[in-house]
């Protein structure tokens, strides 16, 4: 019998709607008395997740979700279901046992949740876990507005989003083959919940450098690279398009700039030195080659961002993007299209720190760094150079021509039957400012604590762990 993932998602959503995390706090943890310590939300996150899963599995007996998480709770939160404990005190008791558990046990519980949510958008539990969680798609709006009011998860699935999902695998393969050029373990990660706060969640598109232990749990070592993949649907064109043809005939930055400028809203925004960029595009440049000559409409910068953007731009404008141009060779006998690198060069394009994608990137790097710190043998002596880094990858494809639609597109020995033809990859490194990231995290944790207090009258601590993050991000003095 086929598993009905849509129905599972619907059933999970109904459970969460019945019992939000706020109602859970009021109803299940109202007897919590731990005056010796603060009530920490990361333990509440684990309690609440356990509660939701137990309730779901009891009500819908034909499906058992996250068995490994439940089993690990039973095995490692020692005898937390005590027959002498009143039912009304059950989850308060679980909370206390979690708080007294070893850091390794707590870390593993968050890692098991990551494993249980792999597949991301195809996994019902991934969708459920993102509720009552500050994800990369929400962080910008929350930080700018200083409020959760009206903040909703983006669930629009238009052509651009669907094309992006469809092409994630081939974009990752292109990165592996033509940019990283190293052995690559390719597993889709689930939701990485910040183990320190339990508030933030990051879903990584692609990565390099993460390993997996014998239990298939992630191990975050030195120099992990995070790739945020963006499919630029607005540039999906026919091969005979004038600007596509020119780029393929003469793959240079001049041809690339003409191609970029051929769209009414160019994907790389030109800004003069010292001028504030708009928030429209996530890549900007100081190179006049990308100047469209059109006057940009002025857009006020949020007051709480102006100072930081003037600091973040100089940090990032030193970066250059790597441009890789692709074409294919057609074999009529084998009915194949073999993708190859036609040209590679760098361009003066860098991340726009005013854009929401910059905020997505810093959250992903922060959460991954928390796992790195907790996995490190000696976290007090972490080298800044070994922290996770982030790249944003802009992928542009062209449409298949009629005589290409039934061909097998090949990258190395892997076939792609439905994907369009790769044309451009722009790989842009992002410079993270730990001070700014720490302030964003701390501010949002405070907003989160205030929201819980308003909803429940409970004083909950959302531990940000920014001290450890700042310490890890600071350059260590050289020994004489």
UniProtKB/Swiss-Prot annotation:
It is found in: Host nucleus; Host cytoplasm. Its EC number is 3.1.-.-. Keywords: Endonuclease, Exonuclease, Host cytoplasm, Host nucleus, Host-virus interaction, Hydrolase, Nuclease. It holds the Pfam family Viral_alk_exo. The record marks 168, 205, 228, 230 as: Required for function. One of its GO terms (cellular component) is host cell cytoplasm. Its main location: host cell. Signal peptide: none annotated. It is an enzyme of class 3 (hydrolase). HAMAP family: HSV_AN. Plays a role in processing non linear or branched viral DNA intermediates in order to promote the production of mature packaged unit-length linear progeny viral DNA molecules. Exhibits endonuclease and exonuclease activities and accepts both double-stranded and single-stranded DNA as substrate. Exonuclease digestion of DNA is in the 5'-> 3' direction and the products are 5'-monophosphate nucleosides. Additionally, forms a recombinase with the major DNA-binding protein, which displays strand exchange activity. Interacts with major DNA-binding protein; this interaction increases the nuclease processivity of the alkaline exonuclease. Belongs to the herpesviridae alkaline nuclease family. This is Alkaline nuclease. It comes from Human herpesvirus 7 (strain JI).
């Amino acid at each position: 019998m086929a598993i009905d993932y849509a129905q599972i998602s619907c059933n999970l959503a109904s459970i969460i709607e019945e019992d939000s995390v706020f109602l859970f706090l009021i109803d299940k943890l109202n007897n919590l008395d731990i005056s010796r310590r603060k009530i920490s939300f990361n333990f509440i996150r684990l309690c609440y997740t356990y509660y939701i899963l137990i309730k779901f599995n009891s009500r819908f007996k034909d499906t058992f979700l996250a068995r490994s998480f439940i089993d690990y709770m039973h095995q490692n939160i020692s005898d937390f279901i005590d027959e002498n404990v009143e039912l009304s005190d059950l989850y308060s008791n679980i909370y206390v046992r979690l708080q007294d558990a070893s850091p390794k046990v707590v870390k593993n519980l968050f890692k098991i949740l990551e494993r249980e949510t792999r597949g991301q958008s195809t996994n019902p539990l991934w969708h459920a876990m993102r509720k009552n969680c500050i994800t990369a798609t929400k962080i910008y709006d929350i930080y700018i507005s200083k409020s959760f009011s009206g903040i909703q998860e983006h669930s629009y699935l238009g052509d651009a989003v669907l094309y992006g999902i469809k092409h994630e695998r081939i974009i990752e393969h292109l990165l592996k083959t033509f940019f990283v050029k190293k052995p690559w373990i390719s597993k889709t990660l689930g939701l990485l919940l910040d183990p320190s706060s339990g508030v933030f969640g990051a879903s990584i598109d692609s990565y390099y450098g993460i390993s997996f232990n014998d239990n298939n749990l992630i191990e975050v070592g030195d120099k992990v690279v995070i790739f945020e993949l963006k499919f630029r649907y607005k540039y999906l064109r026919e091969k005979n398009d004038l600007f596509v043809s020119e780029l393929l005939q003469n793959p240079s930055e001049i041809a690339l700039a003409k191609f970029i400028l051929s769209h009414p809203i160019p994907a790389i925004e030109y800004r003069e030195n010292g001028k504030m960029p708009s928030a429209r595009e996530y890549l900007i440049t100081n190179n006049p080659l990308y100047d469209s000559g059109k006057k940009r409409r002025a857009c006020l910068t949020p007051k709480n961002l102006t100072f930081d953007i003037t600091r973040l731009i100089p940090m990032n404008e030193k970066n250059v993007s790597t441009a890789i141009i692709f074409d294919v060779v057609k074999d009529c006998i084998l009915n194949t299209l073999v993708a190859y690198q036609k040209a590679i060069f760098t361009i003066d394009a860098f991340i726009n720190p005013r854009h929401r994608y910059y905020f997505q990137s810093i959250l992903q790097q922060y959460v991954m760094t928390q796992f790195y710190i907790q996995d490190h043998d000696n976290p007090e002596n972490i080298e800044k150079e070994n922290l996770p880094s982030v790249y944003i990858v802009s992928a542009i494809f062209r449409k298949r021509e009629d005589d290409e639609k039934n061909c097998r597109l090949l990258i190395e020995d892997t076939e792609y039957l439905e994907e369009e033809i790769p044309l451009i990859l722009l790989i842009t490194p992002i410079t993270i400012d730990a001070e700014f990231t720490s302030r964003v995290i701390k501010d949002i944790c405070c907003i989160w604590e205030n929201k819980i207090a308003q909803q429940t009258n409970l004083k909950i601590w959302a531990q940000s762990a920014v001290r450890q993050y700042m310490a890890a991000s600071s350059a260590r003095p050289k020994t004489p």
